[in-house]
Amino acid sequence: MKILQINCVYDYGSTGKITRDIHRGLQNNRVDSTVLYGRRQKVQEAGVYKTCTEFEAKAWNVLSRLTGRPYAVTPFGTLTLLHRLEREKPDVVHLQCINGYFVDIYRLLNYLKKNHIPTVLTLHAEFMYTGNCGHAFECNEWKTGCHNCPNQKEAINSTRNGAAAWNWKKMKEAFEGFDDLILCPVSDWVGERATQSPVLKQYPIRTVLNGIDTDIFHYREKEALVLREKLNVGDRKMILHVTASYTDPVKGGKFITELSQRLDSEKYVVVVVDGLNNPPPKDFCGIYYGRANGQEELAAFYSAADVMVLTSYRECLPTTCLESLCCGTEIVSFYFHGDEGEGSFPEKYVHFIPHGDMEQLTDTVKNVSEHHEEKKICCEAGRKIFSQKVMVENYEKIYKKLLKQSTD
């Protein structure tokens, strides 16, 4: 059995690491595995190929603002990717996150469909069934064709008249007529949304939770003590916020700033780890650390914290939550599916509250930080659900089932 994954990046960001973990996990299980990716650094690793130049991807990023078509891009990169597909002749193609201006999504889907290649599609975000935006929020235009998109500029970075409706129609056409396609949302909520979309509702769904490297993300007691001393936390409760971008409005950094003002600085300290090194506002009252120096240090931050706080407006299945739980630290989070939490998480260790309710956020953070479960117990609960080993095993089962189905 030969599996070929396609993702925008490799070994970078959440989807890049997931793609890497599946690739290496399959190889360890003696499954023939290949990865094609389009953005960032060129990786020197067996079976991993970069298919698009940064120049072409960036050029089409700009051009797509004029055309309004962010998924009909990069002809040379697309041709390179399709040629590699022909050369590799995989039994199953696994599509991860394929936005990022490195491939023409419609051409890729039509190629897979025309050549009857069994395909697994992981839904990390919403754009594959909205046809446009990564998060639809309260908008329901994606259910009927995006004819009156209220947020087109934010959704596709273009104001071209009718662009959202065109994109939706093209995505629907590209998905029509697949012989063997299975959808793998990363959470039940994403899967439920996909069943409401005319683009994807006709295909079978199997939720596969993301997994992380629990050899890295586990409770690190010694490193935690060293880090708390380094940060001069003392006897205070350490409130951790890990974010890809503190200044991104969707990530809710403003709520962390307000939380830092509400908490007694003699009893609590808010610590921010920010992937983009965006400094918080001047009125932030805590420790802004910036980007962690590698995965091991990030695991030490989770291990050192008394509670991890998530304040995003929308998330599908945030990797930070998986990492925190596997390091033994409970989570306080706004509902990241509107008015819903995520049933995939062990309820005992993840505490959801209504978005924007600062009184309840403050009270819950205080309570959890002072009465949290023993670290090792929380860590073990996380490992049972979110380890990369479990994720790879689940995907292997799906590959085999899909391949058998296609040959019957």
Residue ranges of predicted features:
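A short, active-site helix/loop in glycosyltransferases that binds the activated sugar's phosphate group
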Residues: 130-134, 158-205, 212-216
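Conserved donor-binding/catalytic core segment of Leloir-type glycosyltransferases
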Residues: 184, 232-251, 257-260
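Nucleotide-activated donor-binding/catalytic signature segment of Leloir-type glycosyltransferases, i.e.
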Residues: 274-296
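Short alpha-helical donor nucleotide-sugar binding micro-motif in glycosyltransferases
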Residues: 300-305
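Aromatic "clamp/platform" in nucleotide-sugar-dependent glycosyltransferases that forms part
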Residues: 313
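Short hydrophobic beta-strand element within catalytic cores of glycosyltransferases
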Residues: 330-333
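Conserved acidic donor-binding segment of nucleotide-sugar-dependent glycosyltransferases
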Residues: 350-358, 367-372
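A short, well-ordered alpha-helix in the C-terminal region of glycosyltransferases
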Residues: 373-387, 394-397
